[in-house]
C-alpha cells in the first residue's frame, strides 16, 4: 500500500522530534488514510485510499 491519498496526493511528511535538550531525531507524520468504496466519474465502483480531509470535504462520493 502506498501511503498516499488517491484524490489530493497527500503523502507522509518528514521532520524532527525536538526534545527538551534540543536533541533532534527524524520522524514521519503519516496521513489518515481510509480504504473506502468510491463511485468514480465513469460511474464504476472501486476501492481507494482516501484521506479523511477529502472525505469530510465531500471530494469523493461513497458507494
UniProtKB/Swiss-Prot annotation:
Signal sequence coordinates: none
Key words of the record: Ribonucleoprotein, Ribosomal protein
Gene name per UniProt: rpmB
A GO BP annotation: translation
HAMAP family, per the entry: Ribosomal_bL28
CC annotations in GO: ribonucleoprotein complex; ribosome
GO molecular function, one term: structural constituent of ribosome
NCBIfam families registered for this protein in UniProt: L28
Origin superkingdom: Bacteria
PANTHER family per record: 50S RIBOSOMAL PROTEIN L28, LARGE RIBOSOMAL SUBUNIT PROTEIN BL28A
Family statement drawn from the similarity comment of this UniProt entry: Belongs to the bacterial ribosomal protein bL28 family.
SUPFAM superfamilies noted in UniProt: L28p-like
A Pfam family hit: Ribosomal_L28
The protein's name: Large ribosomal subunit protein bL28
